[in-house]
Amino acid sequence: DRAAALLEEVEMLPEHLRRYPHEFSGGQRQRICIARSLAVEPQFIICDESVSALDVSVQAQVLNLLNDLQERRDLTYIFISHDLSVVKFMADMMAVMKDGKIVEFGPSEAIYRSPREEYTRTLIEATPCDDLENIRSLVDQRNKQRNDIL
């Protein structure tokens, strides 16, 4: 069954097909949205604030999943977020917009390291103190430990 295969691709169980929407966590709902988008075999996916409502550890899991899917399916993402640490984590190139206009554009790492615009600096300073890259490392370690046990 195609729906079950899509759920498995986003690290959910086929049994989840029989659940009601209110029975899912925020992270599970986000995975379902990803599975739905994959159903049409897209070349690119627009992710608009796709992890902003999730706690940071679940954000890291969903972002890792998106990265894995990108490699497996050769996907391109347009990633929209006010959290520049998320954009830096996901994107090779970054465009910072203010009032509907691009005020800064370039490699994500370079912009994050030395932003030219005051607005960009303000966004970076507003980044949550939890570092997504450290959380990704912890999630990877935890997954490795689980796999070692199994």
PLM region spans:
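A short, surface-exposed alpha-helical micro-motif characterized by mixed small hydrophobic
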Residues: 87-89
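Hydrophobic anchor residue at the start of the ABC signature
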Residues: 34, 62
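C-terminal boundary and immediately downstream tail of ABC-type ATPase nucleotide-binding domains
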Residues: 113-150
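A short, proline-enriched helix->beta-strand linker immediately N-terminal to the Walker B motif
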Residues: 39-43
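Conserved ABC ATPase "signature" region
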Residues: 1-15, 124-125
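Conserved ABC ATPase signature
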Residues: 20-24, 28
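ABC ATPase "signature
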Residues: 102-106, 114
